[in-house]
Amino acid sequence: MNKYLIFRTDKIGDFLISAILIKSIRRNDPDSFINVIASKENYNYIKSFKIVDKVTLLTKGILSKLKLINLLRKEKYNTIIVHDGKRRSILISLFLKTNFKIVSNANLNISYFSDIKKMLNLLNFSFDKADLNTLNNRTYVSLDNLENNYILLHFDEKWIHKEYISNYINIEPSEKELVSFFNLLVNKTNK
């Protein structure tokens, strides 16, 4: 079994780009083990993805990073991918022995998809457009136990607590459903 360690220590939207890479790895190497190093901002969200076997939290402080390095050394990963391009991730990866290491070029004005395709080529893996749909590989929190109906309008993740997304479902309404909803909302508020 091949073991992959992927660094994604930034925000949720950045992880969604990495989810494409992870889904491609999983499709090409279905028996693999994938561990994602996450930040406190995206840790809970990443845990909800079925395509990720383990999520490890990267915390602040030199001592915690040294403990993390020791923990990761024991795991013995075949491939390490620094997809966030952060110096701290690159530095941690330098202390880890592996057969193969890839550092993202995302900070060099290269398209994210070009970067992902390049990484997949380095791994001798193929890219499939179906890998772009990553949300179907997520375990959503059940809302069956709610006593009252409610509506949540959410326009930007900066409006709500940093870990908000781990508790909500993205329903992706069609234009017709959205217009119908707003008409219903207008009718109810005008009474």
Task: Please describe what each predicted stretch is.
Residues 1-191:
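Catalytic machinery of carbohydrate-active enzymes
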